[in-house]
């Protein structure tokens, strides 16, 4: 029988920084910020472009219009994106295949930006369960949700878990649950959702994303920078796979979803 391993110690938390630090800074040249992922869902693929804000104008992030945005697959088939709204570029015709390699190319204001993403092997949710939490747990009422998945031994895998209730991501404490299969390769893995309790008649959708490494690395760096975790004593820009000093990320992932209704015992 394969070992079932818990991921409690492999949960990375995404927290917000609340302290305001006043520093004298010179105005810097804005950089392009690229946000986009491809996945195996039938939804339109979206790439968002903006620029970093000026320190002296906090909260203002200019959108980037009139860019040329394309994605090319490993067979040389190019898909051009249309600007559906200012700064947002979409395609409904891009066909994404598992284990396929895709190259993003952006031309904006005389500059070229590129990134590559490889769609990972899809890992499915095995099952979902819920139970009364142990004594002295973080919450004393309601039920604790647990997701099980069988990690494939032939791949290095990176995951993100999202829980939805009434169509909205459910995470009252702002946690982002990402983990990999280090020390758990080829095993049945279970993750308990410790962020929020669930109650009778709740209908919960659980989404398991299998991430490519660049997306995982980006999320991991965001976690460490936001929370001051993992030895990040010298804050810097999050790790990215984008060229030409752009910020943000271009990633790929596959999706498995399952639904569970919480019934009273």
Predicted features along the sequence, with ranges:
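C-terminal motif of bacterial Sec signal peptides marking the signal peptidase cleavage site
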Residues: 14-16
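A sequence/structural signal for flexible, mid-protein segments enriched
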Residues: 18-265
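Sec-dependent signal peptide recognition
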Residues: 2-10
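N-terminal hydrophobic targeting signals that begin at the initiator methionine
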Residues: 1-2, 18
């Amino acid at each position: 029988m394969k070992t079932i391993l818990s991921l409690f110690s492999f949960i990375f938390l995404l927290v917000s920084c609340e302290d305001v630090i006043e520093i004298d800074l010179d105005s810097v040249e804005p950089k392009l910020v690229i946000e986009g992922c491809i996945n195996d869902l039938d939804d339109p693929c979206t790439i968002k472009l903006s620029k970093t804000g000026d320190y002296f104008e906090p909260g203002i992030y200019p959108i980037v219009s009139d860019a040329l945005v394309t994605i090319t697959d490993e067979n040389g088939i190019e898909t051009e994106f249309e600007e559906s709204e200012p700064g947002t570029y979409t395609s409904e015709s891009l066909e994404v295949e598992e284990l396929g390699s895709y190259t993003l190319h952006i031309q904006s204001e005389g500059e070229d930006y590129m990134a590559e993403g490889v769609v990972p092997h899809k890992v499915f949710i095995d099952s979902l369960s819920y139970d009364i939490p142990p004594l002295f747990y973080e919450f004393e009422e309601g039920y604790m949700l647990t997701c099980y998945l069988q990690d494939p031994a032939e791949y290095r895998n990176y995951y993100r878990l999202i829980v939805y209730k009434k169509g909205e991501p459910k995470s009252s404490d702002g946690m982002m649950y990402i983990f990999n299969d280090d020390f758990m390769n080829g095993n049945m893995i279970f993750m308990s959702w410790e962020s929020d309790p669930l109650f009778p008649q709740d209908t919960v959708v659980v989404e398991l994303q299998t991430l490519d490494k660049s997306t995982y690395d980006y999320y991991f760096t965001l976690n460490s920078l936001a929370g001051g975790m993992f030895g990040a004593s010298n804050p810097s820009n999050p790790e990215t796979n984008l060229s030409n000093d752009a910020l943000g990320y271009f990633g790929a992932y596959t999706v498995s979803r399952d639904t569970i209704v919480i019934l009273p015992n």
